[in-house]
Every structure is written in structure tokens, then in C-alpha cells.
Amino acid sequence: MQWEVVIGLEIHTQLATQSKIFSGSATTFGSEPNTQASLVDLGMPGVLPVLNEEAVRMACMFGLAIDAEIGKRNVFARKNYFYPDLPKGYQISQMDLPIVGKGHLDIALEDGTIKRIGVTRAHLEEDAGKSLHEDFSGSTGIDLNRAGTPLLEIVSEPDMRSAKEAVAYVKAIHALVRYLGICDGNMAEGSLRCDCNVSIRPKGQTEFGTRCEIKNVNSFRFIERAINSEIQRQIDLIEDGGKVVQETRLYDPNKDETRSMRSKEEANDYRYFPDPDLLPVVIEDSFLETIRAGLPELPPQKVERFQTQYGLSAYDANVLASSREQADYFEEVVKIGGDAKLAANWVMVELGSLLNKLGVEIDQAPVSAAQLGGMLLRIRDNTISGKIAKTVFEAMAAGEGDADSIIESKGLKQVTDTGAIDKMLDEMLAANAEQVEQYRAADEAKRGKMFGFFVGQAMKASKGKANPGQVNQLLKAKLEG
């Protein structure tokens, strides 16, 4: 039987506010346990929550960016459940009247097509604390620093049909919230976490199958692996005569499998009711218009502009626009270096490789956009070749200065003097007389392969400094003359 996969995602986005959603406690990551927890966060009697307006503003920014309905009147509710790191015994969230209603987000698939994914809603809520199992022998510690940190939970429609589509959607959300400046997107620190709802059904069937939720997956790679693992588990289970049970599961990356955590709760299990300590939030049109006016250029618009303005391919434009910092870096390089396609290649390949090696983001790049742009100018005016440029780039990355000073101090200027190149080629060909005779006796197909040998010998003789274009032109004339 052929199966169709149905996937919906819930993405928990930690908002980049300086203080918590209902208290004045700081939200700094990595502080000593329980040093950023106020009486409100601890759920002490007699204290009242006060809503952080910045969290509301950030949620509205997201809603406007996905062309969603904004709840002009939204209500906070108590979600009741017991967990050791939830001191109040309930979580303040939103149920019936969320701040962001239906919207959509377009994602780019691997084949270059665009697919629209519906967003059901996005609601504000507070994060829970954190249980510390490793630091205690025979017991568990509780760190409430995270309790009360503002979250925007983004709930998609079940519109995705493969793990790759799900990853593309999460990447699009990740890029968007970073562009908006409402989340740092650091998945390793838990700033963006994903719950994956997965079900299967016979191809052609419209009724949904029984879904299972995979909780708290925190990397793009693990999202893809977790979903594929769960898909295969459900297929094997049904084809062996079993039945999928609705439940919450965890993904084990070491075993590459999901395992049962608990039965899946429904909304009525949480006994939602409006929080009596918080008034309904009324959002005025003037508030939204101020936010709308301040929205930055968003990833889809930037991708389109990069293609039309700079002549980049859809793939290159999507890669460069995947983060606001990278897009800004690229445009700064183009402003100085002039050639957009050359700049795109260096930013994506050479700089990308360097950043991966160092394990840092582009805002910590050891080579500034101004330095890289200056080096590209020297490639374009034939001061250095593309090969020598890699040596210059490595020196800039090592902190040895800008391109001009490195080229000067290391004597890396390209040899463009025709007489000097001509003499060097004569010496190289004399040293390879046997290969010259073989070349002249060969047919066109073999000559093409052999020509590369002579070019390599010429560049070796010049220590990479000879202008490749001139070498090719003069060498061809000498070999075929």
C-alpha cells in the first residue's frame, strides 16, 4: 500500500525581550540557577502578573509578517497541569482568543518550487523552568530562571507531506524570526524548539490518520531524522496489523528512534479558563500601523530582489538571504567589490567554509565585509588572480591586515608583463619538450586534456602569480604555432 504522510508543527519561539513576560526578571541565558526568578516566577501567594508590552509588540510583528489576522481582543488563560518545574501548578497561555490568527508562510523546496504552508495561530505563553538531572545524585534539581520567559508558540496547519518539507518550514520560520529581531534562533540554547505532529494515511484518503507528537526537537537535522523515524514506525506498525495510538513521544538521536513518553493530552485535559489576574488585551489599529511601518525587508522579498537586482540564481539568493546578517554582509561586499556574482561565490564558499571551520556565525567573521570587498577589487583589476586571492583571504582571516597590505608585504602581485610571461613559458616548454611533441601529435580531444598539464606547469613556475588569461592565450599560440 502507498502511504501519504501528514505533518503539522508547533514551534516554540523564545522572544528576545530583556525581561520576562509577566515579571521584571531578566532573561539572560546561562546565569546561575535560580538567580533570575522573582516572586511572580516562583508563584508565591499575593503577587500579580504584569504583561510585558514588548512581548505583545513582537507577537504582532510576527503576525503582520505572515499576513495573519491579529486578535484585536485576546485573552490569557490558565493551562493547568502538574510538573516539578511549573511552580504555580499552571502555565499562563492563550486558548480561545490568541494574539495571532490564521496566516501563511511560503517555503522554497529543493526542486525550486514554492509551497504555501498555513499557520493556524500563534499565541503568547510563559515558558516553564528546567529540571536538572545530571547535577544531583539520586535527585533532581529545579532551575526556575527560564520560568516566565516569553514564548510565541507558532502552530502550523497539517500541510507538510515529508520530513524535508517540515525542515524547510522550520528554516523559514527560523529565518523570519531572526530577520524580525524577535528571537535569536539559537536552537542549541532552546530559543527555538519544535514539536512534530506526524500521521500517515493511505494515499488518496482525505481523513487524517492517528497522530503522534514528537516533543522538543531542537535541530534541523534531528527534526528530519525524528520525523522519518516516526513515519517508518507507523508504517511498520500498521502493516504488521497493529494500530497507531495517539501519544506523545521523544526522539532518541543515539538510537535514531522515537519512544513513548505519555498518552497525548487534549485541550480539555488542561482545564483551560481565563486567567482572572490578567485583563483581556485590546490591540488598537494605531499600534499595529506603527509596527507595520517598522517591519524590515523580509526573506521572500529579499530573495526576489537579489535575483532581479544582482542577477543571482534562486539557489544563491535563498542561501544568502537565509539570515539577515549574511544578507547584509553580502550587500556590503558588493557595495565595495562591485561584482555581485563574484561576491556571492566568495561569501557562500570561502567565507562559509571558514565560518564552519571556526564554528562561528557571520557576525563574528574574522574577515570583515570591507576587507573581502577590497580583495575582490584586486581580483577584478587583475592585481591578483583567483588562486592568489585564496592566500590573501587566509592571511586576512589570520589578522594580517587588509588585502592591499598583504599583497604588498608578501609580493603577491600578479605578473601581467607579457614579456616576462613569454620568457617563463619558453623555459617551461623547453623543460617539457617530450610532452610538447606528444601534444602536437595528438588529436583535438587529447589536446584538451594535455593543455591543462602545461597550464599547471606554467602557474607552478610563476608561483601562481602569472595572469591565467594571458598564460592561456600565449601558451596556446606557442603550442600550436
Swiss-Prot record:
A GO biological process held by the record: translation
Keywords: ATP-binding, Ligase, Nucleotide-binding, Protein biosynthesis
Catalyses which reaction(s): L-glutamyl-tRNA(Gln) + L-glutamine + ATP + H2O = L-glutaminyl-tRNA(Gln) + L-glutamate + ADP + phosphate + H(+); L-aspartyl-tRNA(Asn) + L-glutamine + ATP + H2O = L-asparaginyl-tRNA(Asn) + L-glutamate + ADP + phosphate + 2 H(+)
Enzyme superclass (EC): ligase
GO molecular function: asparaginyl-tRNA synthase (glutamine-hydrolyzing) activity; ATP binding; glutaminyl-tRNA synthase (glutamine-hydrolyzing) activity
Source domain of life: Bacteria
Keyword Ligase tagged: yes
Pfam families registered for this protein in UniProt: GatB_N, GatB_Yqey
EC numbers for this chain: 6.3.5.-
Free-text function comment from the UniProt entry: Allows the formation of correctly charged Asn-tRNA(Asn) or Gln-tRNA(Gln) through the transamidation of misacylated Asp-tRNA(Asn) or Glu-tRNA(Gln) in organisms which lack either or both of asparaginyl-tRNA or glutaminyl-tRNA synthetases. The reaction takes place in the presence of glutamine and ATP through an activated phospho-Asp-tRNA(Asn) or phospho-Glu-tRNA(Gln).
Stored PANTHER family: GLUTAMYL-TRNA GLN AMIDOTRANSFERASE SUBUNIT B MITOCHONDRIAL AND PROKARYOTIC PET112-RELATED (PTHR11659), GLUTAMYL-TRNA(GLN) AMIDOTRANSFERASE SUBUNIT B, MITOCHONDRIAL (PTHR11659:SF0)
Self-association and partners: Heterotrimer of A, B and C subunits.
Record family assignment: Belongs to the GatB/GatE family. GatB subfamily.
Protein name, entry field: Aspartyl/glutamyl-tRNA(Asn/Gln) amidotransferase subunit B
